[in-house]
Regions:
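N-terminal beta-strand motif that seeds the catalytic metal site of vicinal oxygen chelate
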Residues: 1-19, 63-65, 114-119
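Conserved short beta-strand elements that form part of the metal-binding/catalytic scaffold
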Residues: 28-62, 108-113
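Mid-chain, well-packed structural core segment of small domains
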Residues: 58-87
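Vicinal oxygen chelate
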Residues: 10, 31-34, 76-119
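Catalytic core of tubulin tyrosine ligase-like
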Residues: 22
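Short beta-strand micro-motifs in enzyme catalytic cores
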Residues: 6, 39-41, 63, 95-99
Length: 119
């Protein structure tokens, strides 16, 4: 459903420490990466909602929330029309597309469109 929160990322300077913190706090079972060669530690927190701890130099900048959309191209255009910024969509092969965005106040978020044919 468009606008539903489907994923979030926790940027971490030390992914081991962050995984231990969030796993310990909520009992989340944080696993290894689903993508070879990329340290992206995924977990599920509820029905259909997942997250990941990922290494980042921007640790401390806040959690990135991903919002579902049925048409990522139209959503990117709408973000720009409303005064936000949006990068071009990027593929997550065999999973879907995402676009990194900011709202009019500079708050980061991302758009997501599932697509098993993304490449």
């Amino acid at each position: 459903m468009a606008g539903e929160i489907v994923h979030f990322e926790v940027p971490a300077a030390d992914p081991d420490r962050a995984s231990g913190f969030w796993g310990g706090l909520f009992g989340w079972k944080i696993g290894g990466s689903a993508m070879e060669g990329f340290d992206y530690r995924m977990f599920q927190v509820g029905e259909g909602l997942g997250g990941a701890v990922m290494p980042s130099e921007k640790a401390g900048s806040g959690v990135i929330i991903y919002y579902d959309t049925d048409d990522i191209d139209a959503a990117v255009a709408k973000v720009r029309e409303l005064g936000g910024t949006a990068d071009e969509k990027q593929p997550v092969p065999t999973h879907g597309w995402f676009a990194a965005c900011t709202d009019t106040e500079g708050n980061p978020f991302s758009l997501w469109q599932g697509d098993s044919n993304a490449a």
